[in-house]
Curated annotation (Swiss-Prot):
Forms part of the ribosomal stalk, playing a central role in the interaction of the ribosome with GTP-bound translation factors. The gene is rplJ. The lineage of its organism: Bacteria, Pseudomonadati, Acidobacteriota, Terriglobia, Terriglobales. One of its GO terms (biological process) is translation. This is Large ribosomal subunit protein uL10. Pfam families: Ribosomal_L10 (PF00466). One of its GO terms (cellular component) is ribonucleoprotein complex.
Length: 181
């Protein structure tokens, strides 16, 4: 069934609204994908904070005009699908890569992260990186560790002094009597 101009315009507008705030995308192609496989992929992408669509190449190119992922959607050939997010690109890449390992019918074409087009190899490398949350927690640990060590050292001086005084009291060295020489 051919799309009417009005229906094409509606699809372009809908996709354009979705892509407007997207900062990262992974474009792929597939052959003989079953409905259950497609459903599973959509679930994984949604769980990673993204959206997934099978797109007509020319409509996707028009819809992406003026967006950060425009460069990735220009000049596509063959069957194409796009997973996109405005959130963590690593989470999206991990979700897609995990699913692709189990489903050979799907292959990556390219990706785009913050306006930079990345190759299939770089998509795989992106999937192996730690996510934003993990990087932030490691960074906070590195920032907090020196202050924590300093506080421990400063507390140790007072604690050690208290231990010495306590030992002196227990042995009777501070009883007020002068020790004979």
């Amino acid at each position: 069934m051919a799309l009417t101009k009005a229906r094409k315009a509606e699809r372009i507008e809908t996709l354009a609204k979705e892509l407007e705030h997207s900062t990262s995308a992974i474009i792929g192609t597939f052959a003989k994908l079953t409905v259950s496989q497609d459903f599973e992929l959509r679930q994984k992408v949604r769980a990673a904070g993204g959206r997934y669509r099978v797109v007509k190449n020319k409509l996707a190119a028009r819809a992406s005009k003026g967006t950060q992922i425009e460069a990735a959607l220009q000049g596509l050939k063959g069957v194409s699908s796009v997973a996109y997010t405005s959130g963590d690109p690593v989470a999206l890449a991990k979700a897609m890569a995990d699913w692709v390992k189990e489903n050979a019918e799907f292959t990556f074409k390219l990706g785009i992260v913050d306006g930079k087009v990345i190759t299939v190899e770089e998509v795989d490398q992106l999937a192996k990186m730690p996510g934003k949350e993990e990087i932030f927690s490691k960074l906070l640990y590195l920032i907090n560790a020196p202050a924590q060590r300093l506080a421990t050292v400063m507390a140790a001086t007072g604690r050690d002094l208290a231990v010495v005084i306590n030992q002196g009291v227990e042995k009777g060295k501070f009883s007020g009597e002068q020790a004979s020489a």
